[in-house]
Amino acid sequence: MSIAVFPGSFDPLTNGHLDIIKRASGIFEKVIVGVGNNTSKAALFTPQEKMTLISTVVKDLPNVEVAIMKGLTVQFMNEVGAKYIVRGLRNGKDFEYERDIAGMNSALADVETVLLLAKPKNQNISSSMVKEIGSMGADNMVKFVPKAIVEALKERLNAQKK
Protein backbone atom coordinates (compact mmCIF):
# COMPACT_ATOMS: atom_id res chain seq x y z
CA MET A 1 0.00 0.00 0.00
CA SER A 2 1.36 3.44 -0.90
CA ILE A 3 1.16 5.58 2.22
CA ALA A 4 2.13 9.25 2.26
CA VAL A 5 2.46 11.72 5.09
CA PHE A 6 1.64 15.39 4.60
CA PRO A 7 3.33 17.02 7.61
CA GLY A 8 2.83 20.55 8.83
CA SER A 9 1.87 22.78 11.71
CA PHE A 10 -1.42 23.76 9.98
CA ASP A 11 -2.05 26.71 12.28
CA PRO A 12 -4.55 27.05 10.68
CA LEU A 13 -5.11 24.70 7.73
CA THR A 14 -5.47 26.82 4.59
CA ASN A 15 -7.19 26.23 1.28
CA GLY A 16 -3.71 25.68 -0.15
CA HIS A 17 -3.09 22.86 2.34
CA LEU A 18 -6.50 21.36 1.58
CA ASP A 19 -5.80 21.40 -2.16
CA ILE A 20 -2.53 19.50 -1.61
CA ILE A 21 -4.34 16.96 0.60
CA LYS A 22 -7.04 16.38 -2.01
CA ARG A 23 -4.52 15.99 -4.82
CA ALA A 24 -2.32 13.67 -2.76
CA SER A 25 -5.37 11.53 -1.92
CA GLY A 26 -5.76 10.92 -5.66
CA ILE A 27 -2.16 9.76 -5.97
CA PHE A 28 -1.64 7.62 -2.87
CA GLU A 29 -3.73 4.83 -1.41
CA LYS A 30 -3.56 6.48 2.00
CA VAL A 31 -2.60 10.00 3.10
CA ILE A 32 -1.92 10.83 6.72
CA VAL A 33 -1.99 14.51 7.62
CA GLY A 34 0.68 14.74 10.30
CA VAL A 35 -0.11 17.62 12.64
CA GLY A 36 3.16 18.82 14.09
CA ASN A 37 4.21 21.69 16.29
CA ASN A 38 6.47 24.42 14.95
CA THR A 39 8.46 25.49 18.00
CA SER A 40 9.68 28.64 16.23
CA LYS A 41 6.13 30.02 15.98
CA ALA A 42 3.52 30.81 18.62
CA ALA A 43 0.62 28.43 17.97
CA LEU A 44 -2.93 29.69 17.74
CA PHE A 45 -4.45 26.21 18.17
CA THR A 46 -3.30 23.18 20.15
CA PRO A 47 -2.33 20.05 18.21
CA GLN A 48 -5.56 18.37 19.37
CA GLU A 49 -7.67 21.32 18.21
CA LYS A 50 -5.93 21.33 14.84
CA MET A 51 -6.45 17.58 14.47
CA THR A 52 -10.18 17.99 15.21
CA LEU A 53 -10.59 20.91 12.80
CA ILE A 54 -8.69 19.19 9.98
CA SER A 55 -10.59 15.92 10.54
CA THR A 56 -13.84 17.83 10.03
CA VAL A 57 -12.56 19.34 6.78
CA VAL A 58 -11.30 16.04 5.28
CA LYS A 59 -14.15 13.81 6.48
CA ASP A 60 -15.33 13.19 2.89
CA LEU A 61 -11.91 11.95 1.76
CA PRO A 62 -12.01 8.23 2.69
CA ASN A 63 -8.30 7.58 2.31
CA VAL A 64 -7.19 10.55 4.43
CA GLU A 65 -6.43 10.32 8.14
CA VAL A 66 -5.25 12.97 10.58
CA ALA A 67 -2.80 12.28 13.39
CA ILE A 68 -0.68 14.25 15.82
CA MET A 69 2.97 13.92 14.93
CA LYS A 70 5.71 14.11 17.55
CA GLY A 71 9.42 14.09 16.86
CA LEU A 72 10.97 13.88 13.42
CA THR A 73 8.78 13.39 10.37
CA VAL A 74 10.81 10.33 9.35
CA GLN A 75 10.24 8.77 12.79
CA PHE A 76 6.49 9.32 12.44
CA MET A 77 6.60 7.85 8.93
CA ASN A 78 8.29 4.74 10.27
CA GLU A 79 5.56 4.39 12.92
CA VAL A 80 2.77 4.55 10.33
CA GLY A 81 4.54 2.63 7.55
CA ALA A 82 4.75 5.56 5.12
CA LYS A 83 7.41 5.83 2.42
CA TYR A 84 6.39 9.18 0.91
CA ILE A 85 6.41 12.74 2.21
CA VAL A 86 4.10 15.14 0.38
CA ARG A 87 4.92 18.83 0.38
CA GLY A 88 3.41 21.79 -1.43
CA LEU A 89 5.47 24.41 -3.23
CA ARG A 90 4.24 27.98 -3.60
CA ASN A 91 7.42 29.55 -4.97
CA GLY A 92 11.16 29.24 -5.47
CA LYS A 93 11.86 29.99 -1.82
CA ASP A 94 9.72 26.99 -0.83
CA PHE A 95 11.65 24.86 -3.33
CA GLU A 96 15.02 25.77 -1.80
CA TYR A 97 13.77 24.93 1.69
CA GLU A 98 12.04 21.69 0.68
CA ARG A 99 15.04 20.51 -1.35
CA ASP A 100 17.26 20.85 1.73
CA ILE A 101 14.75 19.11 4.01
CA ALA A 102 14.22 16.31 1.46
CA GLY A 103 17.97 15.72 1.39
CA MET A 104 18.11 15.52 5.16
CA ASN A 105 15.10 13.20 5.35
CA SER A 106 16.51 10.83 2.74
CA ALA A 107 19.82 10.76 4.65
CA LEU A 108 17.93 9.73 7.79
CA ALA A 109 15.55 7.15 6.27
CA ASP A 110 14.49 5.43 3.06
CA VAL A 111 11.80 7.96 2.12
CA GLU A 112 10.83 9.87 -1.01
CA THR A 113 9.64 13.46 -1.05
CA VAL A 114 6.88 14.27 -3.53
CA LEU A 115 6.50 17.98 -4.29
CA LEU A 116 3.18 19.30 -5.58
CA LEU A 117 3.01 22.78 -7.05
CA ALA A 118 0.46 25.10 -5.51
CA LYS A 119 -2.28 26.21 -7.85
CA PRO A 120 -1.97 29.92 -8.75
CA LYS A 121 -4.94 30.90 -6.55
CA ASN A 122 -3.14 29.41 -3.51
CA GLN A 123 0.40 30.62 -4.15
CA ASN A 124 0.13 33.62 -1.85
CA ILE A 125 -1.65 31.91 1.03
CA SER A 126 0.21 31.06 4.22
CA SER A 127 -1.06 30.32 7.72
CA SER A 128 0.92 33.30 9.03
CA MET A 129 -0.71 35.67 6.53
CA VAL A 130 -4.15 34.25 7.29
CA LYS A 131 -3.65 34.90 11.01
CA GLU A 132 -2.41 38.41 10.32
CA ILE A 133 -5.28 39.49 8.08
CA GLY A 134 -7.77 37.68 10.32
CA SER A 135 -6.53 39.58 13.36
CA MET A 136 -7.15 42.82 11.46
CA GLY A 137 -10.80 41.92 10.93
CA ALA A 138 -10.91 40.55 7.39
CA ASP A 139 -14.42 39.23 6.84
CA ASN A 140 -13.87 37.12 3.72
CA MET A 141 -11.60 34.49 5.28
CA VAL A 142 -13.31 31.70 3.31
CA LYS A 143 -11.09 32.73 0.38
CA PHE A 144 -8.11 31.50 2.38
CA VAL A 145 -9.30 28.81 4.80
CA PRO A 146 -11.99 26.10 4.61
CA LYS A 147 -15.42 27.21 5.78
CA ALA A 148 -15.33 24.76 8.73
CA ILE A 149 -12.25 26.55 10.09
CA VAL A 150 -13.35 30.17 9.59
CA GLU A 151 -15.48 30.38 12.76
CA ALA A 152 -12.89 28.70 14.99
CA LEU A 153 -10.25 31.05 13.60
CA LYS A 154 -12.36 34.17 14.15
CA GLU A 155 -13.23 33.09 17.71
CA ARG A 156 -9.61 32.42 18.60
CA LEU A 157 -8.36 35.68 17.09
CA ASN A 158 -11.10 37.66 18.87
CA ALA A 159 -10.24 35.97 22.17
CA GLN A 160 -6.62 37.03 21.76
CA LYS A 161 -7.67 40.68 21.40
CA LYS A 162 -9.30 40.69 24.84
Curated annotation (Swiss-Prot):
Binding site for ATP: 9-10, 17, 88-90, 98, 122-128
Positions marked as site (Transition state stabilizer): 17
Residue sites binding substrate per the record: 9, 41, 73, 87
UniProt-listed Pfam families: CTP_transf_like
Pathway: Cofactor biosynthesis; coenzyme A biosynthesis; CoA from (R)-pantothenate: step 4/5
Transmembrane segments: none
Location(s) in or outside the cell: Cytoplasm
Biological processes annotated in GO: coenzyme A biosynthetic process
InterPro entries given in the database record: Cyt_trans-like (IPR004821), PPAT (IPR001980), Rossmann-like_a/b/a_fold (IPR014729)
Enzyme Commission number(s) from the entry: 2.7.7.3
Function description: Reversibly transfers an adenylyl group from ATP to 4'-phosphopantetheine, yielding dephospho-CoA (dPCoA) and pyrophosphate.
Binding partners and assembly: Homohexamer.
HAMAP family: PPAT_bact
Family: Belongs to the bacterial CoaD family.
Protein's recorded name: Phosphopantetheine adenylyltransferase
Source organism: Leuconostoc mesenteroides subsp. mesenteroides (strain ATCC 8293 / DSM 20343 / BCRC 11652 / CCM 1803 / JCM 6124 / NCDO 523 / NBRC 100496 / NCIMB 8023 / NCTC 12954 / NRRL B-1118 / 37Y)
Species lineage: Bacteria, Bacillati, Bacillota, Bacilli, Lactobacillales
